[in-house]
Every structure is written in C-alpha cells, then in structure tokens.
C-alpha cells in the first residue's frame, strides 16, 4: 500500500486562461492550446481555460462557434493569461477586458500577447 496518494505526489496544475473574442482565428487559438495542452503526458502541469468577454457562443473567423467558454472572472485565478490575437490593431478592446487584464497583472499573473494580441 502506498504511503502517499497520487495527488500528493503531483503538484497543483497551473491555470492558463486564453482569451477569445468574436472572429478569433482558430489557428491563433490553437497555438496556446497545443503549447500548454499536448505532449505533456503522463502529467500535464497546466489546466487551460478558454475565456471570453461574453461567455455566449463566440463565432470564429472560420465560421464555427466556440461554446462552453468561461467568463473573464476566470482570469482572477489564472497564473498565465494569453491574448492570442486581436481583430484589428485600431480597435480598442472592451474596457471590461482591459480591466480584467490589469487586475490579473496587478496580482502577479503573467500576461502574454501573441501577434496582434500583444497590442491589447
């Protein structure tokens, strides 16, 4: 009989939040999902959450909808927040998203912007 449980051996998973928006490119969404979600067996130290300003279904640039999204509240617990892209460099993101990103940064989360997401 083992002296410790498997959960005692495995460290707590790090929460990674990926922010999506109406018109997100499936390719840009896939990059953080692959980096933090694939090939890390037998134990993946990351838990990926896909979040949106509006957790209703979000339509991608390819025309299909993303469902089961978390709200921006998930950013309150994430250790890493990734904005994988943005629609247009000249489009200001919603203030609610900017506030959530600032709050995550203020509490020590790592904020990552990929491609146009670096301008958010």
Spans of model-derived segments:
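Extended, subdomain-level signal for the structured scaffold at the beginning of enzyme domains
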Residues: 1-111
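Gly/Ala-rich beta-loop-alpha elbow adjacent to hydrolase catalytic centers
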Residues: 113, 117
